[in-house]
Structure formats: C-alpha cells, structure tokens
Amino acid sequence: GAAGGGFLAAWLVPRWGWQSVFVFGGVVPMVLSLVMAALMPESLTYLVHRQGSQARIRRIVERCAPGSTSEDTVFVLPAQSRVESHERPVQIVLNRHYRAGSFMLWSIYFLHLFLVYLLGSWLPTMLKDAGMDLQQAAIVSAMFQLGGPLGSILLGWLMDRHEAHHVLAGAYLLGGAALVLLGYVGGHYALMCAVAFVIGAGLNGGGTGMNALSSHFFPLPARATGNGWMHGLGRIGAVISAFAGAWMLNAGWSLAAVTAALAVPAVLIAALLAMKYLHYRGEGRTAK
C-alpha cells in the first residue's frame, strides 16, 4: 500500500489535479471503516474478557475452526496474575511489572518511526543530491517501501518459530548494516535498489513485528492502551525526523554520513530489544 500510493498519485494528479489524491485518501478509508464495522468480527479474547454473548463467540470460533464447538461450549480466560482487579489500563501499563517493558517499547518505537519516516521523507532528496537522476531516486525509494511487505511476512514466519526479540534485533541490525552500505554504493544503480530493499525489509518489517511484540507483552485489559501509547509516543520520533532530515541536508551532510548516522538508532533498537528480553526472560509468552 505504501509503495502503491506513489504510483496511484502519479496517475491521479495529471488527470484530476493534486486535490484528487486527498479526496481518494479521505473517501476510501471512510468506506473501508463501514465495511469493517459490518463484517469484521470482534477479538475473541476481548469478547470473553467483556463477558460477551457465548453464542456470538461460538459463531466466530466456528468460522475459524468448523465443528470445534457445541451449544454447551463456554469460553473463559486464565486469570492475569500480574494485574490487580481494580487497576485501570494506564495503571497496568505503568505498574511494577510492566513499567520497564513499557518504557523500552516506547523508546524502540520512537527510534523506529524516527528512522522510517526520515528515510521515507528524505531518501529521494538525498539520492538526488548524491547525483542520481529523479527517476532513479524515485525507484530506489520505492524499493525501500517494497521491502516492507516481504520483510513483514518473513519476520512473522521467523517470530513464530524462534525467540521474537532475537529475530527483531537481527532485523534491525541487518537494516542498520544495509544503511551504512547504501552510502558507499553510489553509482551502482542496481545494487542501490537491492540495498534499499533490504533496508525496507529490516526496518519496515521490524515495525510490523514490533506491533506483534507489544500485543503479546501487554495483558488483555491494557493491550489497546499499551499499543496506543507506543504508537502515540513513537509519533514524536516521526515529527522530529522531519526536522532532523532537513538539518542534515542543510548542513551539507553526504549520503554516506547520513546513512551512517541513521544506523545508530537501528543498533540502539537492537540493544533495547536485548535488554527487554533479558529483563523478562523466563516468563514465557508474557515476555514476548
């Protein structure tokens, strides 16, 4: 979707003007929200937690696993041993057990959005300043976006089979190494496309994996709050990235200097993932 939006905009603007991009971008999500409200089933764990209709829960389960329930089937959730019954979602996110993990997740997502938004916003300009023509810069930038879907699928597959923190830390280290390499392969157009694809797979794919990691970490009563705070505080990194990218370019930084500097947040993310893993090691799926 991220990569396809650029191609769609290139088709819309010459025909109906720049306003058409905003009309399309506003109308389609509203239509999709109505479709989702009508057809998308509620989370099973949320329905059970809220003591929803058992008949409704059984219908959803039957869609996933036909024949697995009967009229006598009742669904319950195990007690959350680290959640007090009187605690509100915000209190759970910040209680003694979850506080350290919450701060680490927020820091990781701050750095993640700083990275991907700076690259998404400024990479075409940086490549053009490095001597590439506009068309080549656009294609290399598109390869960065196209790496995300493949990276997300591959990392999801790996996270199901290996320790999630290790997989994600490896993805960010790979993305950081590819960032450094990008600054030194100028003039090799095909190689730059391949390296940009790897960067997108590691960084954009890692962001998708972070959503899964966060959802596994927070208990059900605070899952939406924990994820929401992670995304909200992460957006601060996205905002700062716009100013940081402009400052780097105005200061005359070379492509190699910018990409080497951006590898630092990728390494910090890997370090924070390792710290979170070590802090919660031995707690099973809650640690994920």
Regions found by a protein language model. Name each.
Residues 1-14, 23, 28-29, 231-241:
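Glycine-rich segments within core transmembrane alpha-helices of 12-TM secondary carriers
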Residues 94-153:
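Extracytoplasmic gate region of multi-pass secondary transporters
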Residues 152-163, 249:
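Helix-to-loop junctions at the C-terminal end of transmembrane segments
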Residues 166-181:
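Structural signature of the two symmetry-related core transmembrane helices
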Residues 205-218:
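Intracellular juxtamembrane helix-capping segments at the cytosolic ends
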Residues 215-251:
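A late C-terminal transmembrane helix in Major Facilitator Superfamily
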